[in-house]
Amino acid sequence: MKNNTTQSLLLLLLFFFFFFEISHSLSISSNAPLSDTEVRFIQRRQLLYYRDEFGDRGENVTVDPSLIFENPRLRSAYIALQAWKQAILSDPNNITVNWIGSNVCNYTGVFCSKALDNRKIRTVAGIDLNHADIAGYLPEELGLLTDLALFHVNSNRFCGTVPHKFKQLKLLFELDLSNNRFAGKFPTVVLHLPSLKFLDLRFNEFEGTVPKELFSKNLDAIFINHNRFRFELPENFGDSPVSVIVLANNHFHGCIPTSLVEMKNLNEIIFMNNGLNSCLPADIGRLKNVTVFDVSFNELVGPLPESVGGMVEVEQLNVAHNLLSGKIPASICQLPKLENFTYSYNFFTGEAPVCLRLSEFDDRRNCLPGRPAQRSSRQCSAFLSRPSVDCGSFGCGRSVVKPSPPIVALPPPPPPSPPLPPPVYSPPPSPPVFSPPPSPPVYSPPPPPSIHYSSPPPPPVHHSSPPPPSPEFEGPLPPVIGVSYASPPPPPFY
């Protein structure tokens, strides 16, 4: 009797579970906006398919035997796209309504081209579902699209994680997942994409650290702004060959690595609204090609280096909302292409007259005598009475391995005189090693209190260096894919 009761309870629980699952699926399949509860349900549902981090997640796609495909690769693409269609839970614009049948090259948002390794066959080379407002997740079967060069799904409602099987996309050139609801740790699968040049993860919910290997990849553009990443920039940051990197609105802290000045290809860099708390590298002026330089809304200290006057291509320069001090060098305000110089909300005490003749500048809330809208004398006195900053105390340079002291071999004893018994020689004592007296301790001022600001969105980014040419498409091209990265950053999605 007891066993029958237990079985009845189990059956009842299973009934309620499946009823809950079906009711949620039906409600989510409607065109109404997804609530936060439904988003969490989708994320849980996605995780149910994972057996472990590297396990398969199948969508049980059945291929109708009556369907005829041009080649096996398009058959694999059909499986991938049908699995994705099953994983889509809301498609208010009916983008995927024509994802039916074997002619996948006619699917909306799918673009075919001749295979690079066999020009006689067509294969799926690009997917562009930007601004489609689709909700769902990315199934593992997308790894079957092994000829894919472009994958653009920005401004949708995809959530969950990036499939591990993406590592099979060896030809993937551009990956744009921006302005969605992806979450979890940094998708390390992107480190295994050998052809990747453009990576856009901005406006998502990724969190944790960013692997330092990202900055060793041969990328041209990195957008990871507006996430929840929290880490210190690694020493190899300057090894990155990118022309554009945007890290704004995360939780980075610590140093701006001195290796930054070695980024010879860099055109645009935006660090705004993080927690960086060091000095600017003294030789920052070596960045001769930078047009946009934004380190606003951080906790940077010390002077504005004189070498900034060597950034001859800079057009937008923003160091506002920091703890910088000293005088603004005249050479900065004389930069030939400078259009906008913002240095408000710091503690600068002097600026060259030429700075006041710039077409656009902002010097408010400093300690500049004779200028309007400055800090109070009390604020300025309190800050400027602190000990001067020792920029070397932050240890922001690459670590240097000190070589071991050379081993000095003692000279061999002279040969003994024949008529005398050989004398016994004791090796001479080693010369005393002089230890210099310890240098006096360098006073490091206490770190400034954390300052939290309400940050505006980053300035529009204008990219100037196009990547290598994308593969040719036989069908209509998606709008502006990979040419100068002209798509504006998506708005925050809340």
UniProtKB/Swiss-Prot annotation:
Keyword match S-adenosyl-L-methionine: no
User: InterPro entries annotated for this entry?
Assistant: Leu-rich_rpt, LRR_dom_sf, LRR_extensin-like_regulator, LRR_N_plant-typ
Provide the record's note on post-translational modification: Hydroxylated on proline residues in the S-P-P-P-P repeat. O-glycosylated on hydroxyprolines.
List membrane-spanning regions.
none
Q: Which residues are glycosylated?
A: 60, 94, 106, 289, 340
Q: Which Gene Ontology BP terms does the record give?
A: cell wall organization
Could you tell me one molecular function GO term of this UniProt entry?
A: structural constituent of cell wall
The keyword ATP-binding is annotated on this UniProt entry: no
* Tissue expression per record: Expressed in roots, stems, leaves and flowers, mostly in vascular tissues.
Region described as Disordered: 422-482
Q: Which domain of life is it from?
A: Eukaryota
List cellular component terms (GO): extracellular region; plant-type cell wall; plasmodesma
Q: Where in the cell is it found?
A: Secreted, Cell wall
- Keywords, in A-Z order: Cell wall, Cell wall biogenesis/degradation, Glycoprotein, Hydroxylation, Leucine-rich repeat, Repeat, Secreted, Signal
Q: Where is this region: Contains the Ser-Pro(4) repeats?
A: 404-494
Name the UniProt record assigns to this protein: Leucine-rich repeat extensin-like protein 4
| Organism name | Arabidopsis thaliana
